[in-house]
Amino acid sequence: MGNLCSLFTPPKPVKKRKPITKRQSSIGASSSGSGLNSNRWNNRVRSSSSRRDNKFEDALIQEHALAAAAVLFRQQNGGGGSLPFDRSASQRYQGSCSKKNQLPRSSSSRSRSSTDPLLQPHQFLNQGIKLDDLETNHFVLVHGGSFGAWCWYKTIALLEEDGFKVTAIDLAGCGINSININGIASLSQYVKPLTDILEKLPIGEKVILVGHDFGGACISYAMELFPSKISKAVFLAAAMLTNGQSTLDMFSLKAGQNDLMRKAQIFIYTNGNENPPTAIDLDKSLLKDLLFNQSPSKDVALASVSMRSIPFAPVLEKLSLSDANYGSVRRYYIETLEDNAIPVTLQENMINSSPPEKVYRLKGADHAPFFSKPQALHKLLLEIARISPA
């Protein structure tokens, strides 16, 4: 919920590519026949290489567009508040856990083009290891404020390609969930689509929860209720709170350091200006700079037509988190180093206040790493999935 930071201040009333041309080689009158043939050969090689590059980029753009279109099609024709993606399990990772008090950190810094390919076949799980031997091969993805299950379309595709089961949830009033956002009065009401799924899990079955942004507070709430059904919890540029703390409390700590957020915030007063706001929206013209400063333009366009308001009441609610329940679930934090919505300093503050088992860092990732760094994020999720039970 990049827009959680919008709560920092008191409420207010209501390229184009240039055509590729061949270099023209000037041949003097004294040039030999072999020199002319060599220049012509080099021009043909350059032209062929340029055509291949163009075809690759065109195919890449078409691949992303088709994936986004598929998500929108499911939104319009599917039912319910979540998008299940099941596949038979056939591989797993090996790994070991680290001690909680050591706060190990890991960085992702591979070289890449400006746009990540959507699918890379079995880059990380092709080691002849069975997914069935993992503690769980089921990821449950929980979006942040204003987002919906649609934002995970790249992550869903990559995880499913590697044989994982994936459930992407629309929280109440988000994505294709039809509840009126202005009528949501509590965190329990907002996260009900998530708690419903966990409640229905068979005895002994566990999942890996991934919460982005305000989704961090949502998975924390679920961890307190269903600790035995959660193998691991991943906080992705997310609100990771302590007992008795609200999301507003945490994000208000850095209230004076985000002018862009203050400019973007729009408070909604369904019950009149004399009452507290019912929801928060964002200025669409500022979305790219605030949330998607490293993301492809196609994904910014998808978000601009898909994002919805976030309910205000859940942001104010203080969490009750116990060591016996919430504290028993293994936690991991993924920092986004180019984040303009939840700056790294605030992410570090949350980490220091409630240290997780391990911290990962996504270089070059904005507040939407599922758009800006999908492959690097995928690699980290697989690494976390392979960590052996404690």
From Swiss-Prot:
Xref: InterPro entries: AB_hydrolase_1, AB_hydrolase_fold, MES/HNL
EC number(s) given by UniProt: 3.1.1.-
Active site per the UniProt annotation: D213 (acyl-ester intermediate), D339 (charge relay system), H367 (charge relay system)
A single MF term (Gene Ontology): hydrolase activity
Biased composition regions of type Polar residues, renumbered to the chain: 94-104
Gene3D superfamilies given in the database record: alpha/beta hydrolase
SUPFAM superfamilies: alpha/beta-Hydrolases
Span of the transit peptide along the chain: 1-46
Any Pfam family matching the protein: Abhydrolase_1
Keyword set includes Methyltransferase: no
Entry keywords, A to Z: Chloroplast, Hydrolase, Plastid, Transit peptide
Chain's role: Putative methylesterase.
Record-given protein name: Putative methylesterase 11, chloroplastic
Species per Swiss-Prot/TrEMBL record: Arabidopsis thaliana
